[in-house]
């Protein structure tokens, strides 16, 4: 155990749905903080005013709650370092930027975005790296320009002075990473509208919120050089960094829509279980010491360490996730599955809410019957439909006729109709007895008989347990469908 002061954070931008990569980042931060008896902080990085929305933030929060990744500090619940939305922390960034100016680590620049672009293009035309320096930028800080800005109420941008030296990162997943001297030049930390750049806001927040470990996707690795320079300017020890490799599709290419569902919200809509999604996401890069795959969150927490996180890209396979979800689903009590399935069954109009509740025992029996073939909740209505839809099998179908014409099949079907019609009892035991009696008396070939019977009752040669199917169809329906063919 590292220490009980571990503080991790998940800091998403509320600009859309929470994708698989972001969800895994949140999960790894949550797991690491819980394993080390620390704190998991949620911070909303909403300084991109044009793209950030309250709706996206609400959706993000609901998704994290659904995943059971409950934060110790953050929006809604607050904490010692609030506010936890960057849009509410602008004064903090502005104050901290002025601190760096006073220390000589940063400088104001009375320069427009167009002029910054001109400086860049000029450097490129001269065959030089497009790196800004104080000498190049400060020449715009003329007395006339400063007076003009003051008169118009405009604010300067603030640049950080980038030290020209090597930076070394000891990444807990990637290992040693060297950022060579001269990789970048000076860079903006505060825009003229008072809004910080991403790297500056992140560092200020991580300092203020006492973040000890930054666990994030390796697409952020290039940002680390700028962030290390900002930490150095503040004379603050950087947190421990751990950059998790990207997630690829089964074809080895970057995960995208063409690989199927990529956002947690899509999994929610399709009827995945949060515990299955957590389990699967944890295995995208991390592995259990004993190679176990089906793991409750508590066991993942107990065994989670960064040294078991692979530095190679993880492969996202939705088929594997579906399989895992099926394992979790089949381990649940039928009463709980009944509750979980309700919005999917009633939402499909297969049954009304009232029908679902009034016929609870029947629904639970139907769920029990189809469960072995169900992996996600949204598959349930289609699987359950066999017990509810009316069917008129084509008795001229060549495959059906081949089965139906085999020895003893017609006679056995006639006998079943007779026994079911004469016996008022309707339960699986009675159905089994009557089937056995018909089989013993007519002695049909087994496979043709069962294939014919299933086709007559469900218009399919394959399906769930036949005895349960007959019971769930109901006595009247079974008699009606048998009657259609007993004269053939």
From Swiss-Prot:
UniProt cross-references to InterPro entries, sorted A to Z: aa-tRNA-synth_I_cd-bd, aa-tRNA-synth_I_codon-bd_sub2, aa-tRNA-synth_I_CS, aa_tRNA-synth_I_cd-bd_sf, Glu-tRNA-ligase_bac/mito, Glu/Gln-tRNA-synth, Glu/Gln-tRNA-synth_Ib_cat-dom, GluQ/Sye
GO BP, one annotated term: glutamyl-tRNA aminoacylation
Localization annotation: Cytoplasm
Motif ('KMSKS' region): 254-258
Principal place of residence: cytoplasm
Database matches in CDD domains: GluRS_core
HAMAP family: Glu_tRNA_synth_type1
Stated name of the protein: Glutamate--tRNA ligase 2
Organism: Petrotoga mobilis (strain DSM 10674 / SJ95)
């Amino acid at each position: 155990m590292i220490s009980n002061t571990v503080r991790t954070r998940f800091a998403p931008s509320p600009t859309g749905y929470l994708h698989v990569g972001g969800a895994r980042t949140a999960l790894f931060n949550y797991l690491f903080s819980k394993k080390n008896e620390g704190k998991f902080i949620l911070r909303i990085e909403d300084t991109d005013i044009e793209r950030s929305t309250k709706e996206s933030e609400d959706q993000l929060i609901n998704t994290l709650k659904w995943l059971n990744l409950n934060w110790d500090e953050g929006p809604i619940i607050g904490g010692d370092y609030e506010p936890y939305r960057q849009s509410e922390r602008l004064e903090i960034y502005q104050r901290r930027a002025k601190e760096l100016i006073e220390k000589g680590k940063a400088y104001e620049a009375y320069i427009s975005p167009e002029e910054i672009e001109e400086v860049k293009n000029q450097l490129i035309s001269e065959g030089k790296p497009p790196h800004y320096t104080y000498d190049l930028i400060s020449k715009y800080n003329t007395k006339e320009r400063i007076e003009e800005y003051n008169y118009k109420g405009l604010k300067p941008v603030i640049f950080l002075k980038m030290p020209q030296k090597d930076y070394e990162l000891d990444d807990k997943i990637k290992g040693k990473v060297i950022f060579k001297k001269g990789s970048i030049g000076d860079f903006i930390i505060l825009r003229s509208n008072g809004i910080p750049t991403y790297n500056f806001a992140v560092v200020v927040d991580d300092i203020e919120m006492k973040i000890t470990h930054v666990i994030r996707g390796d697409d952020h690795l290039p940002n680390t050089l700028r962030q290390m320079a900002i930490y150095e300017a503040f004379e603050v020890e950087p947190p421990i960094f751990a950059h998790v490799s990207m997630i690829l599709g089964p074809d080895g290419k970057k995960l995208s829509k063409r690989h199927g569902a990529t956002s947690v919200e899509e999994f929610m809509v399709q009827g995945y279980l949060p515990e299955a999604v957590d389990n699967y996401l944890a295995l995208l890069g991390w592995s259990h010491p004993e190679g176990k795959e089906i793991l409750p969150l508590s066991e993942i927490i107990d065994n989670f360490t960064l040294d078991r996180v692979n530095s190679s890209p993880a492969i996202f396979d939705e088929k594997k996730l579906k399989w895992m979800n099926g394992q979790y689903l089949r381990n649940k009590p039928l009463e709980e599955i009944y509750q979980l399935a309700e919005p999917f069954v009633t939402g499909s109009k297969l049954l009304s809410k009232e029908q679902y509740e009034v016929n609870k025992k029947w629904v639970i029996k139907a769920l029990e019957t189809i469960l072995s073939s169900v992996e996600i909740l949204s598959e349930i209505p289609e699987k359950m439909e066999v017990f509810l839809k009316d069917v008129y099998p084509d008795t001229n179908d060549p495959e059906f006729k081949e089965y139906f014409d085999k020895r003893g099949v017609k006679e056995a079907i006639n006998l079943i109709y007779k026994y079911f019609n004469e016996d008022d009892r309707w339960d699986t035991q009675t159905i089994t007895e009557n089937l056995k009696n018909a089989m013993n008396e007519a002695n049909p070939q087994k496979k043709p008989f069962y294939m014919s019977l299933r086709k007559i009752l469900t218009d399919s040669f394959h399906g769930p347990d036949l005895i349960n199917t007959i019971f769930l169809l109901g006595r009247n329906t079974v008699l009606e469908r048998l009657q259609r063919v007993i004269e053939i």
